[in-house]
Curated annotation (Swiss-Prot):
It comes from the Eukaryota. It comes from Trieres chinensis. The lineage of its organism: Eukaryota, Sar, Stramenopiles, Ochrophyta, Bacillariophyta. Belongs to the ycf40 family. InterPro entries: Beta-grasp_dom_sf, Mopterin_synth/thiamin_S_b, Thi_S, ThiS/MoaD-like. One of its GO terms (cellular component) is chloroplast. Transmembrane segments: none annotated. Pfam families: ThiS. It is found in: Plastid, Chloroplast. Gene3D superfamilies: 3.10.20.30. This is Uncharacterized protein ycf40. Keywords: Chloroplast, Plastid.
Amino acid sequence: MTKISTAKTFFINGQEYYTTNTINLHDLLNYFDFNSSLLVLEYNNFICNKKNWEKIMISNNDKIEIVTIVGGG
């Protein structure tokens, strides 16, 4: 009998990651210690509103781009 893996592959800024957990965008950003007030998130080629982050679950082959806002002078 062959065991089927339930691991999901997803990409953050082009870097490949794996998870076997069910996780939403909000929790994923917390896991990676991103300051959510200073970033823009693109999820599968669409800009994602912060109010939806807790509703969107990571799926296999999702592509997430995170752009952080940096101030300076």
